[in-house]
Amino acid sequence: MNNENTKVYIRVSGKRPEGFIDPKPFEWGFKRDKILWTRISKMESLEDMDWKELCQDLGAPESFLKKRSYMLFQKHLKLLSEQMSDSPRMRSPLDTRNSVDETILQNLQASKILNNRFDVPNNETLDTTTNKNNEESGSDLSSSLSVSKSALEDALMDRLQL
C-alpha cells in the first residue's frame, strides 16, 4: 500500500454538525516523528508542552499529535523493557567494583611486578605455584607463597611511587 496513491473514505451515518470543518490534510513521516519525540521526551511535565505551538510547527492536528506522542512513548518503553530483559541482570555498584578489582589483579599478574601467574578466586587470597617439576623460575617467590589483594595493591602503589 502506497501513501501517495491510496485514499481512504469513511462514511459516518448522520448529518454533519453545524460548523464542522474538514481537517486539513497533512503528511507525516520519520523526520516529523523524530522532531516530535525530541520535543516530548525533553519536557518535565505535561503542563510544559504547548500543543498549539507544536501543531503549528509540525502542521498536524492536536489530537493526532497526542495520539502519536502516546505511541512513541509506548514504543520507547517497550524497547527499554526489551533491553532490560535481554541483560541477564542489572549490575550493582558492588559487582562493578569487584570486576574492576579483578581486572586490576589480572593486570598486576601480567605486569613486571609479579612474574608468576595467579588463579583469581572470588575475594580470596591468591596462591601461586611453581611448575610441576618444582624448577626455579628465577623469581624470589617461593612455591607456596600466598598473596592477599591488599598486598598486591601495596606492591602496585610502591611500584608507581604513589
From Swiss-Prot:
Keywords: Autophagy, Protein transport, Transport
Stretches with biased composition (Polar residues): 122-132
Protein family according to the UniProt entry: Belongs to the ATG29 family.
Function: Plays a role in autophagy. Functions at the preautophagosomal structure (PAS) in order to form normal autophagosomes under starvation conditions. Also plays a role in mitophagy.
Other observations noted: Kluyveromyces marxianus proteins are shorter in length and have a more ordered secondary structure than their S.cerevisiae counterparts, which might contribute to the superior thermotolerance and solubility. K.marxianus could be therefore useful as a new model organism for further elucidation of the molecular details of autophagy.
UniProt main location, coarse: other
Subcellular location: Preautophagosomal structure
Gene Ontology biological process terms in this record: autophagosome assembly; protein transport
One GO CC term, this protein: phagophore assembly site
Organism: Kluyveromyces marxianus (strain DMKU3-1042 / BCC 29191 / NBRC 104275)
Region Disordered, residue ranges: 119-145
Phenotype when the gene is knocked out: Mislocalizes ATG8 in the cytosol, when ATG11 is also deleted.
Complexes and interactors: Forms a stable complex with ATG17 and ATG31. Interacts directly with ATG31. The ATG17-ATG29-ATG31 complex interacts with the ATG1-ATG13 complex. Note=The interaction with the ATG1-ATG13 complex is induced by starvation.
This protein's name: Autophagy-related protein 29
Entry annotated with the keyword Transport: yes
